[in-house]
Amino acid sequence: ITIAQTPCPQVIPALREWKGAKGTLSLPVQGNIVINPVDEAALASTASILVEDLKELMGWEYTITTGKAKKNDIYLSLAKPDEQLGKEGYVLAINNKVSIEAPTAQGVFWGTRTLLQMLHRQEAKLAKGTTRDWPEFPNRGYMLDVARKFFTLDYLKEQIKVLSFYKMNEFQIHLNDNGFPQFFDNDWNKT
């Protein structure tokens, strides 16, 4: 009997490449995010954000360490430049642990967003396999018109988290349609 490989996880935007393996990985509710020691300075912020997001999304308690990853750990590391991955691409491998590697810290961050989506959609059971993923478009964003309706700062912060979750990299806030005639002679080119 042949066991089928896992299908491509459904995330937004869709993964560019997926090579499924057999089985799933269930991460523990308490675990470690392990940073490659040579990349600690570059990836500490990403690891901290991931700890917060795992707590908020899954209710999990993760701690950040450095060193080599063990079974069920989440490992973050920078990799050599890769022309196809570019500045925002990453490789996410799921076997007996989760490994996210990318040429840049931004790529590792986007890899953590994919991991969060997979955990959310697959109810904490991750399909084993490897993805190489990179954005199709350099600018991925959203515009919010706050000139016509008031939005709280907390709402705007929440929107930034949503954008991050879906790997968008631009947030345009339309503040005002009014010029300032007393300062710029009512000239839009000067405003």
Predicted feature locations:
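Conserved strand-to-helix beginnings and helix N-cap segments that scaffold or border functional pockets
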Residues: 44-47, 153-157
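Acidic, contiguous N-terminal accessory segments
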Residues: 1-135, 140
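Short strand-loop junctions, especially beta-strand C-caps/beta-turns
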Residues: 36-38, 145-147, 176
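Catalytic domains of carbohydrate-active enzymes, especially glycoside hydrolases
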Residues: 155-178
